[in-house]
Amino acid sequence: SMTLLTTSEEISNVAFGFMGSKALFAALHNGLFTHLAVGPMTAEEAGLACGLHPERTRTLLTALCAIGLVSSENGRFANGAGANAFLVKGAKHDFGDYLRLQVDRQMYPLFEQIEDALANRLPDGATGSYADWFADADEAKLYSESQHAGSLGPARALVRMADLSNARRLLDVGGGTGAMAITLCEAHPKLTATIVEFPNVADVGRAYVAAAGLSDRIEYIDGDALATEWPADQDAVLMSYLFSGVPGSTHESLISSAYDHLSPGGRFMLHDFVVNADRSGPKLAALWQLQHTAFTPEARSLDDAWLEGAFDAAGFSNVSVKPMIPGMTMLAQGVRPGQ
C-alpha cells in the first residue's frame, strides 16, 4: 500500500503535479522529444529545431530534466530512455499523440469540472456524459484518433491474457475505433467482430477497420451501447473502458446482458480502471476513476472484489480479475457454463 505523506515537500509534489503534466504536454506539442531523438542538443539547437526562443526552450528543457524525462550534460540535453521509447513520433510504442490530444486537449480541461461533478451540480452546457461529448463530431474524432493509438498496447495485452482460440463471434460493446477488435482479429484468423458504438465514433472506426483490411470481418452497429439491441449467440463479449464511462447503476445489468448474449462456453472480458478492494490504489487507476467522475458524475469506483462477486452472481464460472496495464487497469474474465 502507499506510504502516507509526512512532509510539506511531499504535499507540494502532489499539489504542483499539474506543472509537470503541462511541461510534458508543451514539449509534445512542439515536437521536442522527436527532435532530441536525433541526438543531444543545446537549448539553442533545440529551440531552432522547434521554432522556439532559446531561453524559453532552456526553461522548458530544465523542467523536463527536473522531472526525469531528459538529461543534461555539459549544456546539452538528451532524451531519457522513457522519452525515446514512448514520446518520439514514429517510435514503436509512441503514445505521444494520445497524451497530447486526448489527455491534454480534452481530459485536462474536463477535470476543471470535478468540484461541480462531486456536488452533482454540473452547469447547463457542461459535458455530463460520453454521449454529450461525442455528439460533437469533431470532439469524437479527436478523442477517437488519439485513443486508437492509446489502445494498441492494451489490445496486445488482451491477446496474451484471453484465450479466444476457439471463438468465432466477438461482440465489442463500446469498442471505439476498433483497436481491440482489429488486434484480436489479426491474432485469430477465424474471428469476426461486431462493435456497438456512437455514430460519430463508428464513422472514424470504419476507416481504421478498412485500413486494416478487415471490413469483411468487423462490422459496426451505430448507437448508444446502453440502449441498442445487441446480437446474440456470441463466443466472446468485450467491454473495455465501458464501465468507467457509464452510470454505476447500469453495471449489474450490463454484466447480465453479457451473459445473456453469450453462447454456452462463451467468454466475457471486462477491461477497465479497477482499484483494490481495500481502496489503497493503484494510484493511476484511482485517479482515472476520479477523472471520469468529472464528466460522468454517476460513475462508480470499481474494485476487484466487487467485480468478482458480480460476475459470480450473474452465473459466470472460471472468474478471474487480474492486472492488465500495470498499475492502471484490470481484466475481469468469466465463462458462461455449458457447451
What are these regions (language model features)?
Residues 1-72, 82, 173-339:
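Alpha-helical subdomain
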Residues 14-22, 26-29, 34-35, 40, ...:
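Conserved Class I S-adenosyl-L-methionine-dependent methyltransferase catalytic core
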